[in-house]
Amino acid sequence: MVNVFLIIIAVVIPALVVLASLYLIAYFQHPDDKNVAYFPKIIVILGLTLAATSILMLPLDVANDGGSGGFPMDILWIIIYIAVAVFAVVICPFAMFFYESEEADPGAGSQIAGAFKGTFAILFAFTALTIVLYVFFGVAEIPTIVVLGRFQVLNYPFMSDISNITYALPEIAAIIGGNDERIRFDPGNPDLLGDGSEYVEYRLDKEFLQFRVSIALFIITMVAFFGWLLFIIFGGIGLVALPFDMIGDFKNRPQRIPYDKYLERKKKIGERATELVEIGKTIQSRTSGGIMSKRDRKNYNRFRQAIFLLEEDYERLKISYKRQGGKVIFYYAQFFGGFVALGVSLGWLLHIIIYMITAPEPFHPFLNSLVIALNNAWGFLGVIVYGLLSFYLLFCVVKGNFKFGLRLFFLFPIHPMRVGNTMMNAFLFNVGLILITSVSITHFCTMAFSQFTSTTAINSLFETAVKNLKILKWFWVVYIFGVFVMAVLTAIFLFIKPKDKPAKIRV
């Protein structure tokens, strides 16, 4: 029977996410994008709604209680994740290329033609890779043990200091009780008459049940795989960088300065700006044909990083003099938020150590106990805490991507989110990143809160099919370590080099 309350929640939550997305665009968008660029804005709203829905479906799956709530969650999960794949691979790239295309460029044809070219290249690469991997590795190998029977042992014929005894019948293996002692049992042996206090479970050797997964499920696996690669890098970086920068921004907040100091700093910024203008002209002249060499692309990324840091320095200078240091309460709120973020990051890292890495026999349930206790006290409390913890991971991914782009700017250009100064291509880039990593974050949370999600359809989807695919199953063994190791390396790196510095551009 369908649970009416769950239907209401399933409708209300996406509606709230849409409203939050509208506010996010209005708060962050650049003035040049006001009342224009409606198509990219619609894609941003739909993408954020889809990503948030995919994460918040996990509590809905828990409340559905193995299907008793009336929702076909196994089908809904596949629909949502296929939609995520379409948005991340096709729609967001198309909208981004469409926004960035220059109609004045005769080589681009039109905005739509330019967008189709870039999108087709991404779609072709993803489709080709998916087909090749599906043909060779689209088979799940489920470990199984064939149980022949469970019998009562009439006697325990060996002494406590002997761990292994072999009898006749070598084709039958047995496990006694809860111990891992393997013996051979001969039911015809008269020495086994006894009190019947022990049990023997007859088993064959471990076997693997093989079946080819559906192409839809394999596409979800591909998105999850790429999402995990991004989550390991950006999520691990963001877990440290987010609280680190929030606290560091308070320490380095703009201070009130006199007029002469303002003129001195403004002059230095002007000199940097003049130098960057000349560098920009040089880069533009070398790429007038629309094609960048590897070196030119690296220089372009360095150029964008230097421009961003220059703009940041100028904004801080204006706050220091024209606004007399700005609103102090904002920086104290950020300072407090930094310590809250630090606590959440430490909580996640501790949970990885004592619960996820030590599975299947974890040292302590930790966050599971918190969510379950709150869920038992009042269902929405558990959902709220889960939502806050999971969305925090999304913020860490966005922060990690930005931090990675600032420090390793030669790999790809940065797409910062700045209040009142964010172009739609930055929105689209970050929405695509959020969509891809939302799948891996849901998978991560399914394992992190496995006691909370044990009867869910998504747990069966990930644990049965996705985690047991050929070759890829070995990746799932190490990715939890990857997140933790990346966080530790980031902490070491940021303590050694805490400040972001402009790159040296070699033109």
Swiss-Prot record:
Q: What is its main location?
A: membrane
* Transmembrane spans: 5-25, 42-62, 75-95, 120-140, 215-235, 335-355, 378-398, 427-447, 476-496
Is Cytoplasm tagged as a keyword? no
Which cellular compartments is it found in? Membrane
Keywords, comma-separated and alphabetical: Membrane, Transmembrane, Transmembrane helix
What pairs make up the disulfide bonds? none
One Gene Ontology cellular component term attached to this UniProt record is: membrane
One Pfam assignment: LMBR1
How is the protein disposed in the membrane?
Multi-pass membrane protein
Instruction: Give the family from UniProt.
Output: Belongs to the LIMR family.
By its UniProt entry, which PANTHER family does this protein fall under?
A: LIMR FAMILY PROTEIN DDB_G0283707-RELATED (PTHR31652:SF0)
Query: What name goes with this protein?
Result: LIMR family protein DDB_G0283707
Origin species, per record, is Dictyostelium discoideum (Social amoeba)
